[in-house]
Structures are given as structure tokens and as C-alpha cells.
């Protein structure tokens, strides 16, 4: 073969080989990115890492899959599976063993190179990696750890890495994964063990909770070591998260929220994600016959989750024994206020911060501003609007200079207040039927 412009035949052979290899990798990418889209537990990263000279990537940046840093900035992640081949046959999963779908598997080296290539082209700023279970949990986990280790040690990748821990993986592999990952997660999937065994007979709560405990031990031990040694290695500094599927089984919202509350009691659990059940396997008679995912219910659970995390509500207050399912027409905070008119009206010029948080239309930021502002002046409707209070809701539950008793939830009755607040919403939903509104 003749040399062209100083290039040897070996050079062109290598070029053809690399082109063929990349085409194969991209075919795998199409299959495995599609298989990964049903995992929602990567909406926030919760970490910012400092860069060092020579490092590649960053956890901080601006809008693949989007996540958010601790300071609220958006980063894009390569959301991918190492393989969608799986030995399990979970009823709710598109990648179940018995499904006839396109299958693919990356080698750890291929996925490492793909991640770096995507980063260098400014497509991504991090990696969210999950996998089907091949052979056994330890074999799969070891290959996932190899990807994270090579990214950190060989390529000096400093971007965000979220690793899904495989249920049943050994403590040694979970410990090694935590040294390279920013966040780790183990999906609970089904909120009760009885239904988990029904839909995923190969799994158990023990195999799920055990890796959770390993992660928690690693995070707490790392935090203790860093109090004594400044440069001690960090272990999953953004903590851990989990995900539950909503609507695949008969659990009540109360059951789901009580489980979430117990998970948040763990010191390293940062987020619980709720995924509306998508009927990807309609032929399985163990699953409910749904036309579409229960998006409104999913949204209400996220709102209830927010109330538990930031507003001081308990799970058994949001969904009690008499109302174990969340109201799909109104948000959980308003539903609680209408069930408990005895707590209202609240005088915004005197009420404590905790009670202000329970008023519909008042958020965390607004409550703080109210407490600060009333030191210097008496608050009025206008000043509350300027602070950011949603007066359309709050007017029925508060007292201020212009709002006095006589027009609140107790005088108008909760049923009437509910009708007044939901009438505009019904008109909007009639115009936008089928579209879930965000506000």
C-alpha cells in the first residue's frame, strides 16, 4: 500500500478500525440510553467538587439528562446503562429477562471512552450509570466500579458520577464504588415487600436495604475521618437516593409517605424519587391496566415530600387514616389546611415561623421574609404580595391590617373555599385537557 502524505498503511488501517469501533459503540449507545430512560433518580447531584490542574470535567456548570448542583445550577449527565441484559424478570421493567427487545452491553473501556468523548465535545458534565444484572450482582457491580475507577484515576475525570448500587452486591464493592462516585443509590422500586415479591420474585427488601446500610456506613465513617484528617478521601459526598414506582401496586399514598419519612430519618438519604408507573409490559396480568402514567399523583407525592423535608409536616399529617390518599385536585398543603380550619386564621404579624409555613400560599422564603420584615413594620396585603405570598390562596387563612375575621376559612367553610380556589383550575384544565400544568 502506497504511503499518502507521510502517512503509513498502519495509520489508515487504524483509522478504519476506530471508525468501525465507534459505529458499534454508538449502536450500543442508542439501545442502552433508551433502556435507561425510566430511572428518574438523578434530578439533583447535591455536590460541588473543586478542580485541580490537569483534571477533566466539573460537577458545576450550566444546562442527555439534567441534574442540579448544591447551589442550584443545572448540569447535563450521560444517563446510560452498562447493559440491559438482565437475569431478573421483574414485571414492571422493560429490561426484564422474558422481554424480546434489542439487547446490548458496553465493556467498561467502551463506556469510559464514550463518557470522555462526550465530555470533550461539551455534551455532558457527568455520568449517571445503572445496569441490568448479568451473571450475579457482584460481577455486574465490579464492572460498574471499573468504569468509575478508570474515569477518576486514568482520565482524571472530575465531573459528577452517580452510580446505581446493585441489590445484593458485596460490601467491598459498594465501599470501592463510594470512593469514586459522588452519589450512590439503590432503588426500592415497590413500597411494600409483599408486592415486591409479587412483581419481582428474584429481589427482596434485605438485598436492597443491605447496600443502603453499606453506603450509610461509608458516608458516616468518611465524615468522621475528615474531622480528624483534612485530606481524608470522601465517600459518596452527595449521599444516597432511592426511587419508588407509584401506581403499579395497591399501596396508599399514606404508606408511601410513611416509608419515605422513615428513609429520610437515615442521616445519608438525600432524596426519594417517585416514578409514575408506565405500563411497558401490558401483557403481565399482575400489573394494573393503565392507559398512561399517573402523573398527577406523582406530582402530589413530590409536593408532599417537599412538605416533609422543608415545611415541618409529618407523613401522618399529610395523609392520615381518614384520608390515606392524596387529593388529586388540590395540593397537599391546601388539603391539610382545609381539613384543619381550627388552626386558622393565622396573624402574619405575630405567628411563629413554623405556623407561617403551614399557611397555603406562603413558602419557605416568604415565611423568612415575613419574620424579618415585621420587626420594622406592620405587614399589609401589599407588602405580603411584594414578599412573594400567593394571596389568592393565603387570604382565606391569614389576618393582617386589611384582612380581618369574617372572610376566612371558618366563616366561608372549607367546602366553599375549595370551590373558590379550584374553579379557575377547572376552567384551565378544560382548555388544556391531557396536559399536566406545572403551576
Where are these regions (language model features)?
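C-terminal extensions
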Residues: 325-355, 381-439
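Conserved, mostly hydrophobic/aromatic
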Residues: 77, 90, 129, 186, ...
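Canonical Radical SAM [4Fe-4S] cluster-binding loop centered on the CxxxCxxC motif
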Residues: 80-109
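Alpha-helical ds-nucleic-acid-binding substructure associated with the helix-hairpin-helix region
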Residues: 290-293, 307-345
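Flexible, acidic/Gly-rich N-terminal and inter-domain linker regions that tether
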Residues: 2-85, 390, 398, 406-430, ...
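Residue-level signature of tetratricopeptide-repeat
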Residues: 373-374
Amino acid at each position: 500500500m502506497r504511503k499518502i502524505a507521510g502517512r503509513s498503511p498502519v495509520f489508515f488501517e487504524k483509522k478504519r478500525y476506530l471508525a468501525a469501533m465507534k459505529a458499534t459503540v454508538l449502536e450500543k449507545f442508542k439501545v442502552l440510553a433508551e433502556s435507561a430512560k425510566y430511572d428518574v433518580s438523578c434530578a439533583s447531584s447535591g455536590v460541588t467538587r473543586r478542580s485541580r490542574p490537569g483534571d477533566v470535567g466539573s460537577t458545576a456548570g450550566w444546562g442527555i439528562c439534567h441534574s442540579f448542583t448544591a447551589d442550584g445550577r443545572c448540569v447535563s449527565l450521560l444517563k446510560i446503562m452498562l447493559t440491559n441484559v438482565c437475569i431478573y424478570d421483574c414485571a414492571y421493567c422493560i429490561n426484564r429477562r422474558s422481554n424480546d427487545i434489542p439487547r446490548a452491553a458496553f465493556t467498561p473501556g467502551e463506556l469510559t471512552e464514550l463518557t470522555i468523548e462526550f465530555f470533550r465535545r461539551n455534551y455532558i458534565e457527568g455520568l449517571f450509570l445503572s445496569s441490568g444484572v448479568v451473571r450475579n450482582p457482584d460481577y455486574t457491580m465490579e464492572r460498574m466500579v471499573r468504569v468509575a475507577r478508570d474515569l477518576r484515576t486514568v482520565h482524571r475525570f472530575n465531573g459528577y458520577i452517580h452510580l446505581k448500587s446493585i441489590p445484593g452486591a458485596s460490601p467491598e464493592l459498594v465501599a470501592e464504588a463510594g470512593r469514586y462516585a459522588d452519589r450512590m443509590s439503590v432503588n426500592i422500586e415497590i413500597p411494600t415487600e409483599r408486592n415486591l415479591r409479587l412483581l419481582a420474585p428474584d429481589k427482596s427488601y434485605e438485598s436492597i436495604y443491605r447496600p443502603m446500610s453499606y453506603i450509610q456506613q461509608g458516608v458516616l465513617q468518611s465524615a468522621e475521618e475528615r474531622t480528624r484528617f483534612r485530606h481524608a478521601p470522601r465517600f459518596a459526598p452527595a449521599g444516597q437516593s432511592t426511587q419508588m414506582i407509584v401506581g403499579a401496586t395497591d399501596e396508599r399514598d399514606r404508606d408511601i409517605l410513611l416509608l419515605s419519612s422513615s428513609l429520610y430519618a437515615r442521616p445519608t438519604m438525600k432524596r426519594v424519587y417517585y416514578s409514575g408507573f408506565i405500563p411497558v409490559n401490558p401483557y403481565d396480568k399482575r400489573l394494573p391496566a393503565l392507559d398512561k402514567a399517573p402523573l398527577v399523583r406523582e406530582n402530589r407525592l413530590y409536593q408532599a415530600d417537599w412538605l416533609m423535608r422543608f415545611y415541618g409536616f409529618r407523613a401522618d399529617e399529610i395523609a392520615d387514616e381518614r384520608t390515606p390518599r392524596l387529593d388529586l385536585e388540590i395540593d397537599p398543603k391546601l388539603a391539610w389546611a382545609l381539613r384543619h380550619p381550627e388552626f386558622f386564621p393565622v396573624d402574619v404579624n405575630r405567628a411563629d415561623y413554623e405556623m407561617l409555613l403551614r399557611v397555603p400560599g406562603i413558602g419557605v422564603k416568604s415565611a423568612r421574609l415575613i419574620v424579618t420584615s415585621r420587626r420594622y413594620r406592620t405587614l399589609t396585603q401589599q407588602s405580603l404580595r411584594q414578599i412573594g405570598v400567593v394571596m389568592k390562596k393565603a387570604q382565606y387563612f391569614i389576618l393582617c391590617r386589611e384582612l380581618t375575621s369574617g372572610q376566612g376559612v371558618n366563616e366561608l367553610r372549607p367546602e366553599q373555599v375549595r370551590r373558590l380556589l379550584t374553579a379557575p383550575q377547572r376552567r384551565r384544565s378544560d382548555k388544556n385537557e391531557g396536559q399536566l400544568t406545572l403551576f
